[in-house]
Amino acid sequence: MITMTQFRKEVDLLGERDVPAEAYWGIHTLRAVENFNISNVTISDVPEFVRGMVMVKKATALANGELGAIPSDIAKAIVAACDEILTTGKCLDQFPSDVYQGGAGTSVNMNTNEVVANLALEKIGHKKGEYNVINPMDHVNASQSTNDAYPTGFRIAVYNSILKLIDKIQYLHDSFDNKAKEFANILKMGRTQLQDAVPMTVGQEFKAFAVLLEEEVRNLKRTAGLLLEVNLGATAIGTGLNTPQGYTELVVKHLAEVTGLACVPAENLIEATSDCGAYVMVHGALKRTAVKLSKVCNDLRLLSSGPRAGLKEINLPELQAGSSIMPAKVNPVVPEVVNQVCFKVIGNDTTVTFASEAGQLQLNVMEPVIGQAMFESIDILTNACVNLRDKCVDGITVNKEICENYVFNSIGIVTYLNPFIGHHNGDLVGKICAQTGKGVREVVLEKGLLTEEQLDDILSVENLMNPTYKAKLNK
């Protein structure tokens, strides 16, 4: 049974409340928990965000202590508390407010101030809640507003999360690249508009998947760099209200040291405090990755379709029974789930777009939902890349005979004859093949367009795999 002795008294603008004695958070967080019961997903469920906010508090304490904005012993205690959170993970579970919240992120900033203050108090031998010694607002939040601390912590967190995503995209890329080498000498039919086109190798197809992911890595790295231009030092609206002389440059310098990232002050702090354009760009890059990854999964599902009435060029690992009514049915469940992840990311991009547009005048209060969308997109894309490699791509095999049969029974190979019989004759050959069911070789020989030796040369496997090879006809 909980008794009143297990609580401490805290006071804010609205009055006095009982706060659990063991909680590192305080009255402002308590009110946020009561006010925003939306998703059952809390800030503690996004630990990278907590770390980003704590890094901001460490950088500001260093700058404030150096400039004399707060006493040096208090600055040291705050820094020590931040270091403990960052190095050990202590208090990461002390952020119970919902990820959906009003107030432009004030609840997250208040929560961070309270946790850091109470941990700092313990480190110097005081009890939680003794705010006359170290105060969440006057000391931890010194020279700050939610409007610069929150977006800066958010940007650092998103940037670091994207680095983890990039690592997993590279992990998936390596699997496709390995398969490209494994399947380098397996001939297959390329298709455009779902119709037979011209031959290629399975290796070339998988290499294209790998290169596609390389492009996304480059694009994400380039775009994520926008997040490192921060508005720390702007305080409420960008004018730097209540900051000491030289604070902005110094605090961003400390932030770069704390994070290990190339953080720079925004060119114009008023613009940076009101604008969310970087989020639109960064999530747009996430959407682009999702669009491309979903297309790859579409291809994997199509190429593995069958087993008797589909393409059946490749085999995906069999992971679970696919039907409650149809015996022996196995479905491409991993590409399917990755498709769904990608759809969610694409939807989140719309959320980020609308929320970024919804600011008024000197502030956009919708950053919490931008944060929720961005962290969710990054998290599920990261997991999807790992899942796709581990449960699908690594185990893909090719049905070589089926692939080659499609090539040699296809009308598409008539394209290789264009330089020798002309496009018009190629059309005629293709039309006869379609009408009669005969093969290209058979019709060309019947029409006397080429000799059997010439056809052997032109339609050799070597020539089909390397279409710039001119064969003996051009020697």
From Swiss-Prot:
One of its GO terms (molecular function) is aspartate ammonia-lyase activity. CDD domains: Aspartase. L-aspartate binds at residues 106, 145-147, 192, 324, 329. Pfam families: FumaraseC_C (PF10415), Lyase_1 (PF00206). The active site is at residue 323. Keywords: Lyase. Its EC number is 4.3.1.1. Residues 322-331 are annotated as: SS loop. GO terms for cellular component: cytosol. The keyword Lyase applies. It comes from the Bacteria. Coiled coil: none annotated. It catalyses: L-aspartate = fumarate + NH4(+). GO terms for biological process: aspartate metabolic process; positive regulation of plasminogen activation; tricarboxylic acid cycle. InterPro entries: ApsA, Aspartate_Ammonia-Lyase, Fumarase/histidase_N, Fumarase_C_C, Fumarate_lyase_CS, Fumarate_lyase_fam, Fumarate_lyase_N, L-Aspartase-like. The keyword Manganese does not apply. It is an enzyme of class 4 (lyase). Belongs to the class-II fumarase/aspartase family. Aspartase subfamily. Catalyzes the reversible conversion of L-aspartate to fumarate and ammonia. Homotetramer. This is Aspartate ammonia-lyase. It comes from Haemophilus influenzae (strain ATCC 51907 / DSM 11121 / KW20 / Rd). The gene is aspA.
